[in-house]
Amino acid sequence: MSSEKEIQQQLSQMQGQGFDPEAQQRQEAQRQEANERRQGILIQILTPDARERLSRITIVKPEKSRQIEDLIIRAAQTGQLTERVDDAKLISLLEQLSEKTKKTTITMKRRTIEDDD
């Protein structure tokens, strides 16, 4: 009986500290629902070839894929897209994004001086 009381006390303490399993479940359900809506929009906008390319990009670089998805969805919502995005259009969007996010690398080559001492 004392173990049940301890469990109840621990649960009430965790809920008092902001740990609410029901709230976490609701948040997870909301995230999943938003992701499903997002995928539904992308299915309507992208051709099958473009969706396949984007899914391969997601495997390698999820953050880049997310940026492209956001860009495409925003363009569709603002009416900038008049037709479905095909593979060629997706490639051009990827190139534009790559140009914006190119990283500059600097390599320093130091000369070594040989002393004949």
Curated annotation (Swiss-Prot):
Keywords: DNA-binding. InterPro entries: PDCD5-like, PDCD5-like_sf. Gene3D superfamilies: PDCD5-like (1.10.8.140). One of its GO terms (molecular function) is DNA binding. Residues 23-39 have a biased composition (Basic and acidic residues). Pfam families: dsDNA_bind. Residues 8-22 have a biased composition (Low complexity). One of its GO terms (cellular component) is cytosol. The keyword ATP-binding does not apply. Signal peptide: none annotated. Residues 1-40 are annotated as: Disordered. The keyword RNA-binding does not apply. Belongs to the PDCD5 family. This is DNA-binding protein DDB_G0278111. It comes from Dictyostelium discoideum. The lineage of its organism: Eukaryota, Amoebozoa, Evosea, Eumycetozoa, Dictyostelia.
